C-alpha cells in the first residue's frame, strides 16, 4: 500500500485524485492533505478518508476547521500556513506527494519533499517553471522520481518508456487551442472572464482555464517539458489538436512518432503517476476511435496568442526569467478575473515585466521567492 499526501486536495486535480483513491481503496492510504478556503469540502474529506494531518493556508479557514474538527471529535492534527504545507509534504510515513496546488505556493513544499526523499506526482507546473534547474538537481541528488500529472507530460513520459533518450528528435506537445482558437486580436478585445473560463474540452480551475485561453498554460508546459525531459526548446513543438485525444507525442530520430491517446480525463494521468510503473483498472471512460472519426492538427498562432511566444523567450533566456514570466502571469490572471485589466493587457504586462526586472541571477529558492514578490508588487501597485 502506498501512503500519500495531497497538496491542494479541494481543487480540480485534488478531487479527481480522491476519485482514483476511492476506486483503488486497497492500494492507497491518504495520510495528509492541504487546502485553502473550502472548509466544508475539507471536512467531508476528513470524515471520509481520515487523514492524520491537515494543513490550511488561510487563517480564518484554519480557525474554523480547528473548531469543527474538535466539535465533531475527528482525530487529525490541523496545522496552519506554509509550515503546515511543508509538514504535510515531508511526513516520515508517506511515500509520494501529489502536488496539485496552483501557483508559486507549491514551490517550497515540493522542494522540501524532494529533500526528504519523497516521490512527487507533479501537477503544480509552476514549480518546474520557476525553479526547474533547482528541482531537477535536488531530485537527482535525492533519488526522487518526478512523475508528471499534466496530461501532456504524462503522455510524453509514457511515450518515452523503453526508448533511448538520445534518440529523441523532438517532442510534440499538443494543445486544444482553448476557447478562442481561430480568433483574431480584434476578436480578443471584447473577451470577458466569463467567456475565457469556458474551456471546450477540459473541466479545470479558474487560473488554468484563463491560462489555457491565452495559451500561457501551453507556454508553461513547454518550460516544464524542457526540465522534465532534458530537451532544448527548439526540439519542443506545440501542435494545436482540437479534439484533445492525442495528449502528446515523441518523434524519434528514425522518423517514428509514438503517442499516447485517451479521452480527455485527468484521472488517467493521475492514476498512472500514482501506480507507476504499473497499469491498473480505471474508472474513466475508454477511448472509442470510431466515435472520434477524425483527428486534426494546426500550428499555433503566436502573433495573436503572444503568451506562448513569451514563454518560449523566457525559457530560452533561462535563469530567473521564467520566474518573472510566471509571477507576472499569476497576478495578471487575478486582475483580469477581477476585471481590473483587459484580456489583451495580460501579455502586455507580462512582457513589460520581462523587460523591467533583472533575471540574470542564480536559481536558488530565496532568489526565486524574492523576485516573485518584487514582480507581483510592481504589478499590483501599477495596475490594481
Curated annotation (Swiss-Prot):
Its EC number is 1.1.1.267. NADPH binds at residues 10-13, 37-38, 124, 126, 205. GO terms for biological process: isopentenyl diphosphate biosynthetic process, methylerythritol 4-phosphate pathway involved in terpenoid biosynthetic process. It is an enzyme of class 1 (oxidoreductase). The keyword Transferase does not apply. Keywords: Isoprene biosynthesis, Manganese, Metal-binding, NADP, Oxidoreductase. Its cofactor is Mg(2+); Mn(2+). One of its GO terms (molecular function) is 1-deoxy-D-xylulose-5-phosphate reductoisomerase activity. The keyword Cell membrane does not apply. Pathway: Isoprenoid biosynthesis; isopentenyl diphosphate biosynthesis via DXP pathway; isopentenyl diphosphate from 1-deoxy-D-xylulose 5-phosphate: step 1/6. 1-deoxy-D-xylulose 5-phosphate binds at residues 125, 151-152, 176, 199, 212, 217-218, 221. Gene3D superfamilies: 1.10.1740.10, NAD(P)-binding Rossmann-like Domain (3.40.50.720). It catalyses: 2-C-methyl-D-erythritol 4-phosphate + NADP(+) = 1-deoxy-D-xylulose 5-phosphate + NADPH + H(+). Mn(2+) binds at residues 150, 152, 221. Belongs to the DXR family. Catalyzes the NADPH-dependent rearrangement and reduction of 1-deoxy-D-xylulose-5-phosphate (DXP) to 2-C-methyl-D-erythritol 4-phosphate (MEP). This is 1-deoxy-D-xylulose 5-phosphate reductoisomerase. It comes from Clostridium perfringens (strain 13 / Type A). The lineage of its organism: Bacteria, Bacillati, Bacillota, Clostridia, Eubacteriales. The gene is dxr.
Amino acid at each position: 500500500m502506498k501512503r500519500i499526501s495531497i497538496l491542494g486536495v479541494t481543487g480540480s486535480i485534488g478531487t479527481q485524485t480522491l476519485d482514483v483513491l476511492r476506486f483503488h481503496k486497497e492500494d492507497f492510504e491518504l495520510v495528509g492533505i492541504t487546502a485553502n478556503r473550502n472548509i466544508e469540502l475539507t471536512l467531508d474529506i476528513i470524515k471520509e478518508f481520515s487523514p492524520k494531518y491537515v494543513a490550511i493556508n488561510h487563517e480564518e479557514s484554519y480557525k474554523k476547521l480547528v473548531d469543527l474538527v474538535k466539535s465533531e471529535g475527528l482525530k487529525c492534527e490541523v496545522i496552519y500556513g506554509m509550515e503546515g504545507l511543508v509538514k504535510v509534504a515531508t511526513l516520515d510515513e508517506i511515500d509520494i506527494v501529489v502536488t496539485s496546488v496552483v501557483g508559486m505556493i507549491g514551490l517550497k513544499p515540493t522542494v522540501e519533499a524532494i529533500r526528504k526523499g519523497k516521490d512527487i506526482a507533479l501537477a503544480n507546473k509552476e514549480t518546474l517553471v520557476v525553479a526547474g534547474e533547482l528541482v531537477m538537481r535536488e531530485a537527482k541528488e535525492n533519488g526522487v522520481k518526478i512523475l508528471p500529472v499534466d496530461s501532456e507530460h504524462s503522455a510524453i513520459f509514457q511515450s518515452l518508456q523503453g526508448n533511448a533518450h538520445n534518440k529523441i528528435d523532438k517532442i510534440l506537445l499538443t494543445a486544444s487551442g482553448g476557447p478562442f482558437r481561430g480568433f483574431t486580436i480584434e476578436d480578443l478585445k471584447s473577451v470577458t472572464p466569463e467567456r475565457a473560463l469556458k474551456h471546450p474540452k477540459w473541466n479545470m480551475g479558474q487560473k488554468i482555464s484563463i491560462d489555457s485561453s491565452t495559451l500561457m498554460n501551453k507556454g508553461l508546459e513547454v518550460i516544464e517539458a524542457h526540465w522534465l525531459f532534458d530537451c532544448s526548446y527548439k526540439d519542443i513543438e506545440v501542435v494545436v489538436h482540437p479534439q484533445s485525444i492525442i495528449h502528446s507525442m515523441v518523434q524519434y530520430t528514425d522518423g517514428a512518432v509514438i503517442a499516447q491517446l485517451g479521452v480527455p480525463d485527468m484521472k488517467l494521468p493521475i492514476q498512472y503517476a500514482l501506480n507507476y510503473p504499473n497499469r491498473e483498472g480505471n474508472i474513466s471512460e475508454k477511448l472509442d476511435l470510431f466515435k472520434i472519426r477524425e483527428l486534426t492538427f494546426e500550428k499555433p498562432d503566436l502573433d495573436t496568442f503572444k503568451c506562448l511566444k513569451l514563454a518560449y523567450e523566457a525559457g530560452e533566456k533561462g535563469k530567473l526569467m521564467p520566474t518573472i514570466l510566471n509571477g507576472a502571469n499569476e497576478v495578471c490572471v487575478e486582475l483580469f478575473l477581477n476585471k481590473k485589466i483587459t484580456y489583451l493587457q495580460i501579455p502586455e504586462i507580462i512582457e513589460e515585466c520581462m523587460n523591467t526586472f533583472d533575471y540574470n541571477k542564480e536559481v536558488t529558492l530565496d532568489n526565486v521567492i524574492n523576485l516573485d514578490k518584487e514582480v507581483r508588487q510592481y504589478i499590483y501597485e501599477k495596475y490594481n
